[in-house]
Amino acid sequence: VSKFRLIEKRWSTNFEKYVFILANKSKYFEKICKLFFPDLKFLTVPKNETWRFQHLIVPSMSNYNDGILTPHMPVWIRHLANLVKKKHTRPHKKIIITRTDAVNRNIKNQQHMLIALKGWECVELEKLSIQEQVQTFAEATHIVSPHGAGLTNLLWCDPGTKVIELTHKSFFGKKVYPVLSHHLGLKHSVLLCDTVPI
């Protein structure tokens, strides 16, 4: 989505007049576009097919594994939240993101953690609509979450929100969410965890 802004800035034009080509199908991307950019046109290249284009703009991705983030980009994306927020309330919730249906990145001692964090609200992002995810993170003062794409929702948090990201030690070099938090004024900590056989 941030690439839309690059086109808009570079050519001072409406990015929705272009057709976007995706390498892989993404249900999340489709939901985002349907909600925020209903007029956007995009296609997914089927596997084992080769396409030829007369005109093609290819955005760079110099750090594919960690993502690229510039300070102005999350601020631009963040304004989209105003389109779907049902109401503006002061942040007041302490939430724990759980991944009970996930194959990996589950928290083995989650029940003990929930007992220790009495009063915190458990949230399963997979069961929420995009609008509900935006609202949930906008209302949070504290967030504990395993590393994962759901932390993209940090975009909707107010400055000063405290975040603890649980991640495996081998992921230490992945700084995309701490960098995102830095640009948004969030207080982000990373807790390195061990892998336990299930």
Per-range role (PLM):
Residues 1-198:
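The feature primarily captures lumenal catalytic ectodomains
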